[in-house]
């Protein structure tokens, strides 16, 4: 039996259902016709997170009859995804939901009505996008293009060449991603200043602000260079015309996994293999993702919005969106991930999920979340912080089907310690009721990071450090230390003082805060010899 992921292949409904696939329960051809005639929702970024989350929520609305149109997807970075994966499969995709109990759910997602290359070199597709952006029916354009997609400058603060070229050329011949989006908004402006919501759903802080600043930079440059009609910048800056809601998204969607590919091939799925595009995107006819997901959205849509609330999106005000982000980043998810990443690298783990089988590491992250973090958590009111941690520690991180690695999460740790742990320390310092003496696990993570920077695991074997922009700055503090050599604590204290007092890394001056001794004690303990990291953590958690 062969299952073909095409519109014609879905006609063999019994074969798909016999293999355990949930199929679209709506008239897909009618949906496609309606969506093309009266498009409501365009999404930029055709990658895995879109197919696993946004496209599936559109399908839920279609399945339960609360909405009659799907989503149009446009890809402006790697258009091979559209040509080589979307269109050969008639814009169908398979969502494989990976559950913590080891089971999988398989869903054929059919809500994508049209897929387009957001590329001015592909004139028919870009002309179609321009047409869509002039439609009265268009309510929102959402984005998952990664945080880098909103960047207009390089690390030196200079405009990227493509951005500078677009600023000078105007909206008719854009090549940068944000330039394309600005060009399409200009079409909407020319069509009568029609309202629309531009919604970043990328996993970055204040994402709506990032999108707004990027697009208004184009409008400002184009007006200044007299490349657009007067009023375009004012149109973008009028929230009753164009809004930029802030959002918080939370769903882990790794690249296509070989074990999932094998399951689907055993079902009879034809052409299940992933492809790697010339831009190094891994894409397959399927996406594998965890079951847990959140999308909290600032409810500001000047032209209305689809009934996304009925598919699990949480609509609220900007302050609550911000609180949700702080809850997640400062307490309930990200600090736990970083702790496991650092010690996972030191203790030779290859999967985050495997670490949760270690009772010492499990106890450590439970202490960070429940005991040290929850007393100062920002409670958004729409989600329970304790329930969020419960889900993270009992369902999400232990999920054996989620191929997430400590090495991936350890990337850029120097940029993460401040927000993930420093904010908690600041809250303790500011509170008359709380005592810094209760912080035991967080200083151990800092000590673990110092030990990690040595590039030597707990067996004494070398390993490659994950990429980090400050490695050249911070590694020299520890690179000459040796395992098992007696450490002169006083000399070490002086050597490390400039690092431990660096509030840009830790969020606070650890010496001034009175936490440096705790960090040093744990670090010296971890230097005693092979196995010292595990021994230090075991002794520490035995006191919890």
Predicted segment positions?
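Substrate/ligand-engaging "lid" and interaction regions
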Residues: 1-44, 48-544
